[in-house]
UniProtKB/Swiss-Prot annotation:
Family assignment from sequence similarity: Belongs to the HARP family.
Enzyme class: hydrolase
GO molecular-function terms, A-Z: ribonuclease P activity
Name of this chain's protein: RNA-free ribonuclease P
Pfam families, A to Z: PIN_5 (PF08745)
Taxonomic placement: Archaea, Methanobacteriati, Methanobacteriota, Methanomada group, Methanococci
Reactions catalysed: Endonucleolytic cleavage of RNA, removing 5'-extranucleotides from tRNA precursor
Entry EC no(s): 3.1.26.5
Purpose of the protein: RNA-free RNase P that catalyzes the removal of the 5'-leader sequence from pre-tRNA to produce the mature 5'-terminus.
Species, as recorded: Methanococcus maripaludis (strain C5 / ATCC BAA-1333)
HAMAP family hit by this protein: RNA_free_RNase_P
Amino acid sequence: MQKQRFCLDTTAITDSDVRKSLGVSNISESAEKIMDIIAQARVQLDISCHIPYNTVYKELIGFLVREECAPETLIKVNTWLVKKTPNRYEIKIPAEIFYEYIKDLRERINKGMRISENAMYETALEAYILSKPDEKDREDVLNEVLSKTVNSFRDKYRNTLRGGTLDSAPDLDVLLLAKELDAAVVANDEGIEKWAQRLGLRFVNARDFPFIIQEYLDLWDKK
């Protein structure tokens, strides 16, 4: 059997769907459960789980510290997750992938610009309506209209520009390291999943990952 390797994104440990699937209420519990499963799989089956260093590793540790996870959990992370920096100078990515990414990014920028223009028109129209005589003073109009429009604009802009694409160095490092190691990507991120598929990488949804590893372990115990 081919050695199994997995490359973990932060969401493999911290995502809310993972907690629900494990039946736990907080990140500390889910992180400890996942790390125990990973440790058992490493010792019994030589299954290795990798994390890009220091981008994703730093992001994950920061998250766990903010959530006040036990020091023992952090020790398990440092012990059982193999930290490695992707060899960014040697990994070969087809030029077509870069072409698709730039094309996708350009389309998102254009959509974001249209959302910005629409937000300005909506602000001007609502300000005009609310500023009619004997209704509200200028300051109230600005506060009401701008707060409403800015909140709506922020959500639409974020979804358009960031949803379903790679928007950070840690996201890219997960894919690069997985490609270098021929490992399966573990994440709950639409952008990572989309580009993992385009790179021909195996992808495992974060909420399924602990159960996949546990299935390997259960089968081994039956031998």
